[in-house]
């Protein structure tokens, strides 16, 4: 019987352990940031240990970094976390993409941009959205702080192999519909737990037609479907993306092995889901988890359970309303889901020549300094600023309420991020997940509009 892509990569990294039992996996790349690493470093000190492989460990600063004045960190806890990582990186010999560096940015942006993220690797990070890197054909997953320490000390991790779930996506995406809409629709249709216990492999002609940046958007939100892992088979698009990047120094030697990373034709999956995107519409979430979403022209559903009732109360909405009825106050273009160059380009097409609605506060936060530099070379900063957007420095920003960028209590925000939980963007903030183009159109119109009519 053939093997799935996931099984092939997993099996190559097993150090010990029987099939069906927890197995010890070798970790090829460990990415860290300032929030989940301090206690892990302290654990090493208490045990008088060093990092097993500092050369396979890379740090960046992202969650707490201010996006207006990056060196003016007013919050004491945030400042301590940042300075602690800077000191720990120096003490333990870890390369850090520090504040002010041209390579600093959100951890799931930095890995791919530098070429650290490569097909066939096992990649971990103390962050929920590590599956982003699975778009390259890597096994990438988020871990907790105690596991961060375990990888520091041993460069390995005990894991139980999940089942395999194939998501086959076919059809041509309509104009104005994007990768973000694919993953939001899948979660809306199948729930926030359909991937629990599975490794997701996204495949099909639609996936193969996507850019690497669009593929990363889909894998980024695998965790919102309950899955620890999301993967796509690497192909020529992948190889061209990796080629020439600073840390892809063995490209010409590795590419032959990468070409073997695919699911065999006779491989069996434990479950298969199919999706035809030919008639897919732009998606908007109305509630407090990514499952609570609708296609743009679909009314919000009737209350089915206590979770729906609570979500409607929190969001200040009612069944039967539509996305265009939402009274928006903020628009956020950013996060590790949708703050790449192509995302900003898509949004700029909508924004160019227009002005932000007077009722809207709109900010753009490039996901990394690399993206910011490239965007400014293209003049995107001028397009956004001329329209009335705030053009910020890189960081996690308004994706989560851990830094100065927060949505006020009770205000609705069109956001390109990945989570719309209660209080995710600040106390009482009401988050609506959409694609960059949808967010941009909302900023201009002061409400959600059908972006397909804007970008035609």
UniProtKB/Swiss-Prot annotation:
One of its GO terms (molecular function) is 3-isopropylmalate dehydratase activity. Keywords: 4Fe-4S, Amino-acid biosynthesis, Branched-chain amino acid biosynthesis, Iron, Iron-sulfur, Leucine biosynthesis, Lyase, Metal-binding. GO terms for biological process: L-leucine biosynthetic process. Pathway: Amino-acid biosynthesis; L-leucine biosynthesis; L-leucine from 3-methyl-2-oxobutanoate: step 2/4. Its cofactor is [4Fe-4S] cluster. The keyword Amino-acid biosynthesis applies. The keyword Oxidoreductase does not apply. It holds the Pfam family Aconitase. Its EC number is 4.2.1.33. [4Fe-4S] cluster binds at residues 336, 396, 399. It comes from the Bacteria. Catalyzes the isomerization between 2-isopropylmalate and 3-isopropylmalate, via the formation of 2-isopropylmaleate. Belongs to the aconitase/IPM isomerase family. LeuC type 1 subfamily. This is 3-isopropylmalate dehydratase large subunit. It comes from Staphylococcus saprophyticus subsp. saprophyticus (strain ATCC 15305 / DSM 20229 / NCIMB 8711 / NCTC 7292 / S-41). The lineage of its organism: Bacteria, Bacillati, Bacillota, Bacilli, Bacillales. The gene is leuC.
């Amino acid at each position: 019987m053939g093997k799935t892509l996931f099984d092939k990569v997993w099996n190559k990294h097993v150090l010990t352990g029987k099939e069906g039992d927890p197995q010890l996996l070798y970790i090829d790349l460990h990415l860290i940031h300032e929030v989940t690493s301090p206690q892990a470093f302290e654990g090493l000190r208490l045990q008088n240990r060093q990092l097993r492989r500092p050369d396979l460990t890379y740090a960046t600063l992202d969650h707490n970094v201010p996006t207006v004045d990056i060196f003016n960190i007013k919050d004491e806890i945030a400042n301590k976390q940042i300075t602690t990582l800077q000191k720990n990186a120096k003490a333990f010999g870890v390369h850090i993409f520090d504040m002010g560096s041209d390579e600093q940015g959100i951890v799931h942006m930095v890995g791919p941009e530098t070429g650290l993220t490569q097909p066939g690797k096992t990649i971990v990070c103390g962050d929920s959205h590590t599956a982003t890197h699975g778009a390259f054909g890597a096994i990438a997953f988020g871990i907790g702080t105690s596991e961060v320490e375990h990888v520091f000390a041993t460069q390995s991790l005990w894991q139980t192999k999940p089942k395999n779930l194939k998501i086959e996506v076919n059809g041509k995406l309509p104009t104005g519909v994007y990768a973000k809409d694919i993953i939001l629709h899948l979660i809306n249709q199948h729930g926030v737990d359909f991937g629990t216990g599975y490794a997701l492999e996204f495949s099909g002609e639609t996936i193969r037609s996507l850019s690497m940046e669009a593929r990363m958007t889909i894998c980024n939100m695998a965790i919102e479907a309950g899955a620890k892992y999301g993967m796509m088979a690497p192909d020529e698009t992948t190889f061209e993306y990796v080629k020439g990047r600073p840390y892809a120094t063995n490209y010409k030697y590795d590419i032959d092995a990468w070409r073997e990373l695919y699911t065999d034709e006779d491989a069996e999956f434990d479950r298969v889901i199919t999706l035809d995107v030919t008639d897919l519409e732009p998606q908007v979430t109305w509630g407090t988890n990514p499952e609570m979403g609708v296609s743009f022209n679909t009314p919000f559903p009737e209350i089915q359970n206590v979770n729906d009732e609570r979500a409607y109360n929190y969001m200040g909405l009612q069944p039967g309303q539509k996305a265009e009825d939402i009274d928006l106050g903020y628009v956020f273009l950013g996060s590790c889901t949708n703050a790449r160059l192509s995302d900003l380009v898509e949004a700029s097409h909508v924004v160019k020549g227009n002005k932000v609605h007077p009722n809207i506060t709109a900010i753009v936060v490039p996901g990394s300094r690399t993206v910011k530099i490239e965007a400014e070379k293209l003049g995107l900063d001028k397009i956004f600023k001329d329209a009335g957007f705030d053009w910020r420095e890189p960081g996690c920003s308004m994706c989560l309420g851990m830094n100065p960028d927060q949505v006020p209590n009770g205000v609705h925000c069109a956001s390109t991020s990945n989570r719309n939980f209660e209080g995710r963007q600040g106390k009482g903030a009401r988050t609506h997940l959409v694609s960059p183009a949808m967010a941009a159109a909302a900023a201009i119109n002061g409400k959600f509009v059908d972006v397909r009519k804007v970008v035609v």
